[in-house]
Amino acid sequence: MARRVVVTGMSVVTALGSDVPEFWDKLCAGKSGVSRLERFDCSDFKVNFGGEVKDFRPEDHFDGKEAKRLDRFSQFALAGAQKAVRQSGIDFAAEPDPYRCGVIIGSGIGGLNEIEEQHAKLFDRGPSRVSPFMIPKLMVNAASGNISVFWKLKGPSSAVANACASASNAIGDAFRLIQHNVADVMITGGSEAAITPMGLSGFARMGALSTRNDSPESASRPFDRDRDGFVLAEGAGVVVLEEYEHAKRRGAEILAEVLGYGMSSDGSHMTAPDP
């Protein structure tokens, strides 16, 4: 018999706020986190706005050495995981079997910031100046791996790279691992940090982004007749999934229950919906 799966912790790192109640209140009030980008000069770009996380300070979550070994997308993911685990109240050190606790984090692109930084070093200063941490920072599974290491979890640890569906896909996979008795607790969700010169110009060249530079706050309008593209943003969303009886035994507050999950593909085009 399939086991029940519940949510016992959740967190967000977004342009609209990095606290779940604050984020939800602003969302319900119709507020936008989209504004002109500030991390780099994009005055010559076709698009100069996005959903930028402007209040995130790595030093609030990691020491200097640790932060330098994490790409921005992994920083978002680990910071989000810390908050979600804190809300769940779970003590991984007290769990009897660390092989029953795991992580799946989705990311469509991974460490794009690191790729751009090291690419510049390669051509400006030569191959000997490329960081030895480049590969472990840019890998899509860097977020999951670093979360596993942080809590010394020895259960399933993997990543999902499935474009815009990466986080939902990751949560669904984690749900199934618990449902089918492979794990008892999973940290799961998604993280993205593709607001970089290359990321912004690449999506703009695809014709995928809205170009409403004069009204960025109202540019995201996916169901509007006059929509002209999506808005590039960054951030993370992380939840703690837990087997129902496991959560009940430790007296955890149950926030929600995951009842099912499915996947499909139109098999038509990489970016356009099936006409």
Cite the ranges covered by each PLM segment.
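Short conserved active-site loop signatures built around small residues
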Residues: 167
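Active-site histidine-anchored catalytic micro-motif
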Residues: 170
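Short, high-confidence coil segments that cap the C-terminus of an alpha-helix
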Residues: 182-186
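Short polar catalytic/cofactor-binding loops
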Residues: 10-17
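Active-site-adjacent elements of ketosynthase-type condensing enzymes
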Residues: 42-52, 110-114, 193-220, 262-275
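Conserved beta-ketoacyl condensing-enzyme motif
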Residues: 7, 22, 28-162, 191-200
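Condensing-enzyme catalytic core mediating Claisen C-C bond formation in acyl metabolism
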Residues: 4-8, 35, 214-275
